[in-house]
Structures are given as structure tokens and as C-alpha cells.
């Protein structure tokens, strides 16, 4: 059912905004929040949410939204892309949500969905690295027990699979889902301009060398991050979700839309 887009945010000299974001963006958002004209409180959720399945990921983000008790916020900023439909269904009872029109986090790192599509189509088999993935890319604690890989018992060696399933079945499982790196041929390190030194690039380069993959350094863009925390959200880049509506996938160039909650 369509959701009437009758919500309007009055952009004042100073707004109070709440950001809920994946921790992969920790350095980028902290850098742009320092330059925002508004008061922005940030809450970062574990990267491992991407690995526990769409429904659980959405539930954890929704719980963070529902847990906001400060009613003085003008809007809630969502630091996620569509991310395997992990934001589909998100809603807020009393404040609008602002979400980037992004396929996934690569869109934010590259600065636009158009640049993302162009690079994706011309560079198959790419494994991306940024500061966030390098220093925060491994699930731990509770989330490590909920990851899809753990649930399927694929975080083990080929020999373990042979003992459990027999050689023929183990070989099939390993080829299908037990060896996720088989689809990659290159590591692309996205340089965002917020790196303290070249240690992250070096780590990405060494990872490529150990796998005999190609390596590329690509200039990212901080622009989408900055525009999200600056306000004045244009419809081409951001979706405004009024209270009582929820996020829906549109499967078109807009990526996400709204429907009645």
C-alpha cells in the first residue's frame, strides 16, 4: 500500500540528529560529524549484523531505532545501504528516518550509486577493503555464533567437512559455500582521505599478494557521508521515511521507497 509522503522537516540553523550506523563507517562518520553544522549523536552497530541474515539484521537495527528515548531529535539518520534488504521494513513511530539510496556500503564509499554501478559492472570479482573492514571486519562474541557461516558449520577446514559429510559431499559443499574467496580475483582498497597513515593500504596490498590477486587503490568520496549529516537531503540521494511508514525495496534506480507500516 502506498504511503503518503506528507512529512516535511523544517531545516533550522541547528538540528539535533541521531545517527545509527554500521561500525564499518566509524572513521568516516566521525570525520564528517566534526564538520556538520548540526548536533549529531552517533550509535554504531557491529559489522557482524550483515552476516546473521536479513531478518535478524533488520530486527537489530529496528531495536536501536525503538530504543531512542530522547524525543528532541529532529530526525534519525540510518548509516546503511539496502544491504541485502537488511533495512527493508524499518520504521519509526514519531520521527522521520533518512536513509541513503545505496545498494550497499560500497555506494557510500564511492560517493554515488551511479559510480558504484559503473565500477561494479567493469570490475567483476573484486574484494573491497577500507579502514573499517580491515580493523572491524571480523564478527566476535554473540554475533560470531549467529553468522550464517557458523550456522552452516562452514567455518572449518576441508578435512573437517570430509569427516562430517564424506569426500564427495564435502567437495561439493566447499566449492559452493565453504570457500567464499573463490569468486574474487582482485582487492580494491578504497582510500577515503581519513586514513592516519598507509598501514591500511599496506595490509590490503599484502592480503592481495598472499592470494596472488591483483591490487588496486581507488579514491573514494566522503561526499555522501557529509551530506547525510549536513541535512538538506535531496531526493535523488536520500529517502525520507515519514513516521508511520516503512522502508520498501523498489528494485529500480531509486533502490528504496516507502510504504504504509
What are these regions (language model features)?
Residues 20-27, 76-88, 103-105, 133-136, ...:
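Gly/Ser/Thr-rich loops at beta-strand to alpha-helix junctions
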Residues 55-67:
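Glycine-rich, highly charged phosphate/nucleotide-binding loops
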Residues 64-116:
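N-terminal glycine-rich phosphate/adenylate-binding segment common to multiple enzyme folds
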Residues 3, 7, 13-36:
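N-terminal basic/disordered segments at the start of proteins
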Residues 39-55, 217-221:
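A short beta-strand-loop structural module common to alpha/beta enzyme folds
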Residues 167-261:
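Extended, basic/helix-rich recognition subdomains
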Residues 95-143:
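Long, charge-dense
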Residues 122-198:
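A conserved mid-domain beta-alpha-beta active-site/ligand-binding segment of alpha/beta enzyme cores
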Amino acid at each position: 500500500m502506498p504511503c503518503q509522503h506528507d512529512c516535511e522537516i523544517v531545516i533550522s540553523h541547528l538540528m539535533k540528529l541521531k545517527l545509527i550506523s554500521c561500525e564499518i563507517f566509524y572513521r568516516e562518520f566521525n570525520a564528517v560529524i566534526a564538520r556538520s553544522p548540526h548536533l549529531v549523536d552517533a550509535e554504531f552497530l557491529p559489522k557482524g549484523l550483515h552476516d546473521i541474515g536479513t531478518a535478524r539484521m533488520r530486527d537489530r537495527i529496528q531495536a536501536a531505532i525503538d530504543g531512542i528515548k530522547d524525543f528532541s531529535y529532529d530526525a534519525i539518520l540510518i548509516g546503511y545501504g539496502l544491504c541485502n534488504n537488511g533495512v527493508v521494513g524499518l520504521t519509526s513511530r514519531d520521527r522521520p528516518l533518512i536513509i541513503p539510496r545505496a545498494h550497499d556500503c560500497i555506494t557510500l564509499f564511492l560517493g554515488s550509486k551511479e559510480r558504484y554501478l559503473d565500477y561494479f559492472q567493469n570490475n567483476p570479482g573484486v574484494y573491497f577493503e577500507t579502514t573499517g573492514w580491515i580493523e572491524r571486519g571480523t564478527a566476535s562474541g554473540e554475533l560470531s555464533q549467529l553468522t550464517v557461516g557458523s550456522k552452516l558449520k562452514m567455518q572449518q577446514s576441508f578435512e573437517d567437512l570430509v569427516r562430517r559429510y564424506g569426500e564427495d559431499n564435502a567437495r561439493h559443499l566447499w566449492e559452493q559455500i565453504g570457500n567464499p574467496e573463490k569468486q574474487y580475483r582482485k582487492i580494491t582498497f578504497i582510500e577515503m582521505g581519513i586514513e592516519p597513515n598507509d598501514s591500511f593500504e599496506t595490509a590490503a596490498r599484502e592480503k592481495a599478494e598472499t592470494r596472488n590477486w591483483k591490487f588496486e587503490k581507488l579514491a573514494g568520496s566522503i561526499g555522501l557521508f557529509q551530506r547525510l549529516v549536513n541535512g538538506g537531503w535531496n531526493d535523488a540521494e536520500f529517502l525520507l521515511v515519514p513516521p508511520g511508514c516503512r522502508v520498501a525495496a523498489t528494485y529500480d534506480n531509486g533502490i528504496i521507497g516507502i510504504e504504509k507500516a
